[in-house]
Regions:
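Single conserved hydrophobic/aromatic residue that forms the stacking wall/gate
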Residues: 1-10
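Structured-RNA-binding interfaces characteristic of tRNA pseudouridine synthases
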Residues: 12-194
Length: 194
């Protein structure tokens, strides 16, 4: 998996559009204030009406797992103590793209207006003999959705759930039927497209 350097695009609004700012100086000053886990690499102007959340066309998340104890991965990847069938899990990922309603993967008790999302990509990738990541792209995500999807895919990969069962979970739209929500430490926002 990648190191702790993940690109992310926060957006800030200025009170004055007249004022020009030296972006290199601003980036340096922000880096002096930010926690060591966060870094600003560049600052670019955007349209005044752009909204960081609502103007996004798609988002891509990655969830990292590893199967051998590794002190360099433990903070940002989930260590699994069992073998998974990643081919079968990728088949389940393709099934995800056939659906638009993901109520089964929404955090219980969420007060969302809709559970509709358009998933355009869902696949596991192997980066070494013992490390993998799941990448998923959609126009939007529900709260806890990616972690619940990964937990359900792990059930498929362990042979505890068939592909037909996986379809029934999605179609049933009940969070209690899906797999467990995996720990947040291994989930990263990889990209936002505008």
């Amino acid at each position: 998996p990648r190191s702790t350097l993940f690109p992310y695009t926060p957006l800030f609004r200025s009170r004055s559009t007249e004022q020009l700012v030296d972006t290199l100086v601003l980036a340096k000053k922000l880096n002096g204030l930010l926690h060591h886990d966060i870094a600003v690499y560049s600052i670019e102007p955007v349209a005044a009406d752009l909204h960081a959340r609502f103007s996004a066309l798609s988002r891509t998340y990655r969830y990292y797992v590893h199967t051998r104890k590794d002190p360099f991965l433990c903070a940002y990847s989930l260590e699994l103590h069992y073998q998974l069938d990643y081919t079968l899990m990728n088949e389940a990922g393709r099934i995800l793209m056939e659906y638009d309603d993901f109520g089964a993967f929404c955090k219980a008790g969420s007060d969302v207006k809709t559970t509709l999302c358009h998933v355009t990509h869902a696949q596991w990738y192997q980066t070494s003999p013992t490390t993998w990541y799941f990448e998923i792209t959609a126009n939007r995500f529900l709260r806890n959705m990616v972690r619940a999807v990964v937990g359900t895919l792990v059930e498929v990969g362990r042979g505890r759930m068939t592909l037909d069962d996986f379809r029934q979970v999605i179609e049933g739209k009940q969070r209690t039927q899906a797999g467990e929500s995996m720990p947040a430490k291994a989930l990263f926002l990889e990209d936002v497209s505008y």
